[in-house]
Amino acid sequence: MHWSDRIAQEIIRRRPDKEEYVCAAGISPSGSIHIGNFRDIATSYFVVKALRRQGKKARLLFSWDEFDRLRKIPVNVAKIARPEGEKPWDEYIGYPYVDVPNPYDDGCPNYAKHFENEFEEAMERFGIHMDYRYQAEMNRSGKYAQYVIHALKKRGEIFDILDSFRTQSAQEGERENYYPVSIYCPHCGRDTTKILSLSDDCTVAEYECACGHKGTFDFTKDFNCKLAWKIDWPMRWMYEGVNFEPGGKDHASPGGSYDTSRVIAKKIFDFEAPIFQGYEFIGIKGATGKMSGSSGLNLTPDTLLKLYQPEMILWLYAKSEPTKAFDFCFDDGILRQYFEFDKQYNDFMEGKGDEFLNTVMANCLLETGEEDGKPVYRKIETVPMSLLVQLGSVVDFNVPMLETVFGKIGQPFTYEQFKDRLDRAKYWLEQCSPENVNRLRPYRNWEVYETLNEEEKKEIALLHDYIKNGGYDLDELNQELYAIPKKVMGELQDPKELKKIQGQFFKNVYRLLIDKEKGPRLYLFLYAIEPEKYVSLLDFSTPMTEEEKQSLIKEEPAPEETEKKQVPLGEPDPVEPIREEIDIEEFSRMDMRVCKVLKCTEIRKSHSCYKLTLFDGLKERVIVSSIKSYYTPEEMIGKKIIVIANLKPARFSGVTSEGMLLAATNNACGCQVIFVDDIVPEGTRIC
C-alpha cells in the first residue's frame, strides 16, 4: 500500500462521517519558494488524491503566511538598489511581508505578492489547484479577532504548556509578563512592540515600541496583530477544520512545533490536532549551497521544470516515503532518473505495474479529463533522455538534423515526440554539465597524434580513408570501428588484449576529434555528423599549417595558480537579529575542536566543494566544504581549523562529510575560514 493511501485511511478512520476533508500546507513568502518547501504541498496533494480515490470529498488548503515578519533580506533582493529617497532594505526587517515593497518591476503591489504569484503560476504547470488563504487578509479583516482575545485570556495556561516543553526553568515574573501576540507598530510598521498591560477582559492593551512609540491597542477593533506561531498554527487548524498537515523534520522532532501545538489545540482551542506527517529535507546532487528561499539561490519548482517534466518531479516525491530523503540531480544522475521514470511509466501504461507503482503514477501524472469514470492522463513520449543529450550535443540541438539522426539509427522520433524534453536536455547539458558538451576541434590535434605509436597512427589513417570513401550504413560503420584494430594488429588470441586495443583506438579518436577520452557512442557520433565536418581532423598526411602552429601556442596551459583566489566582493550583508537563545547545556553538546588539514582535493563534478582530510587529535576524518571559490588546496593543506566534530554525517556531492568547518561568510568579505595558530595542538576543544 502506498503511504498516501495509508494516511488517507487513517484520516477516514478518525472522522468517518465528515463531509469534506481538509489537507493543509503553508509557506511564508520570504523569497522564491524552494523545492524543499514544495514537499509540503506534494505530500498533502497526494493525500488529497488518495482520499478522492476512496470516494471522499477533499480539498488542499494552502496558507500564505504573508503576515509573518521579514527576518532577513535574501541575497538576490539585497543586490537590487532602492529608489532614491526610499529607505534601504534592511530597514524593512520586522515588517510583515505584505508591507514590504516589491523589489521587482512586475506590477505586483508588494514583496509577498511577487513571490506568491511566481509560485502559484508554477503550481498551475503541475496541475495542482489549491484553496489559497492569505493570512494578512485573514488577520486584518478581524476573522481571527475572537481567537486572539481567547488566547490572551488563556495566556497563563499557554505559557505553562510552552514551559513544559523547555529544558530551562522560567524566570521570575516571566509567566505574568507573557503575551501570545505581537502587535505591528502603527508608527514604524515593525513588530518590535512590547505589551505593558492588559485590561481585565483581555480586549485592550497598553504597549510600547522599540522606535519610541507608545499606544493603546483594542483587540476588538484593531487587527494589525498576530498570534505567536505555536498558538497561531493550532488556532488555524481549528478555524479551517484541518484533518492532515505535513511538516519538515524540525517541526516533527520530539518537543518540536507539532508536539507543542497539538497540546495547545486540545487544551486551549478544544480541537483534536490533525494527523501530522514529518518529512525529510530534499538534497541536491551535483550542486551545492544552502537550499533556502531567503538565501537567494532560487532552487524553485520553476527552476526544476527547466530540467524535469512536471510528472517526473511529482514522481520523485510520490515514490519516496516522506521520511526518506532523495536528491534532485544536476549531474548525470538525472539521466538515470529519466530512465527509471520511463520504465515505470511504460509499465503503468501497459498494465504491468503493481499496486504501489500504479498509485505512484496516479499521483504524479497530470489529468486531462475523464473517460468511463477513470482519469485520462497527459501522454508522455519516453524518448530516451540520455540519447537526446548525446545526439543533441552532436548536432547542436538542430531539430531537422536530430530527426534525421534518429531516423538513421533506427529510432525515428519526430519533433512532436521529443519537443517536451529537447529544451530540458539542452539546458541540463549547457548549464549543469558543460564538461559533457561535445564540440569538434577547429584544427588537427598534432599534440595527441605525435604521442601515438606507428600502429595507432595506421589505425587513424584507415579510419580516415573509410570515412572519406563513404558508402556505409550505421551497422557497417560500427563493425568497421571494431575491425580496424584487428587489421593493423592481426588476429589476437587473447580477447582481453583485443578489447584493450580497441578501447585505446576509440579513445584516440575521441581525443583527436573532441579533446576528450570518451564521448557519445562512437559509431553514432561519426554517423550523425556530416563527414565533411570532421574527416580532415583525421588526416595527418599533410604538414602542420600556420594556423595549427598558432593554435598550439594559444592552447598552452596557463601557469598553475599559486596566488590566493580573488572573488568579487560587494556591500556588507544586512546584520541579522540575534537568534533564539540557547542554554549552557545545549551549547556544551557542540563539540568544536582544532583539526589539521592533511589533504585538500577537488570533488569531481562539483564546482564549489573541496574534500578535506583532517586529523582531529584522535583519528582522520573527512569533511566537505564549499570553499573552492575562495581558497586553493595549497592554502588549506597544513593549516589548523575549527571543526564541529559531532555533527551528524551527511552526504554532499557524493562524499560523506563528518563535520563542518567554521568560517565567516559575508558579501563584503566572501568566505573567510577561521584558522588557528599552529601552536594549538590538534584535538583541542573550543569552549
What are these regions (language model features)?
Residues 102, 128-301:
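Active-site cores that bind ATP or allylic diphosphates and position pyrophosphate for catalysis
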Residues 1-19, 217-229, 594-602, 612:
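Conserved oxyanion/phosphate-binding beta-strand-loop segments in alpha/beta enzyme cores
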Residues 24-33, 133, 239-250, 297-299, ...:
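Glycine- and acidic
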Residues 405-467, 474, 481, 485:
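Small-residue-rich helix-loop
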Residues 1-159, 261-263:
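N-terminal Rossmann-like or analogous alpha/beta NTP/dinucleotide-binding catalytic cores
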Residues 553-687:
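Phosphate-backbone binding interfaces of nucleic-acid-interacting proteins
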Residues 448-511, 582-611:
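C-terminal accessory/binding modules appended to enzymatic or scaffolding proteins
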